Every structure is written in structure tokens, then in C-alpha cells.
Amino acid sequence: MAKNSKYQDKQVDAILNDMIAVLEKHQAPVDLSLVVLGNMVTNLLVSSVGTNQRIALANAFSEALLNSVNKQKS
């Protein structure tokens, strides 16, 4: 999703593959998968990000997600 990241592609791909495997294990349809992923993002923001930064980070995340989805359409 991110153009530039401080994390290596290998590390990101490994975590992504683990998360996909969990969703497949539970045979989660797209809507349930999105609910779970959304709840995970919310939990990360609430538990790990200061109150003053949450909205800004949530906006940056949603903008990056929209940019990624729009890029996939072309």
C-alpha cells in the first residue's frame, strides 16, 4: 500500500501472507475480513497512538488505502 516504506518488502509480505492464511483458515468472506481488518486498525490506533495523532494517522491511512485501490483500477 505504501510507496515508500522503512520496512523491507520481505517482512511486509511475510506478515501479509500470515494474515491471509488466518482469514482463509476461518473461511472469512470479504465483508467479514474487512470488519476484522478495520477492527485491527482501530485497535492499533487506540492502543498505540497518542490521542492527538490518531485522527491524522487514520486520515493518512485511509488516503493511502484509497490511493492504492484507485491505482489497482488502472
UniProtKB/Swiss-Prot annotation:
The lineage of its organism: Bacteria, Pseudomonadati, Pseudomonadota, Gammaproteobacteria, Pasteurellales. HAMAP family: UPF0352. This is UPF0352 protein PM1884. Belongs to the UPF0352 family. NCBIfam families: PRK13689.1. Pfam families: DUF1414 (PF07208). SUPFAM superfamilies: YejL-like. It comes from Pasteurella multocida (strain Pm70).
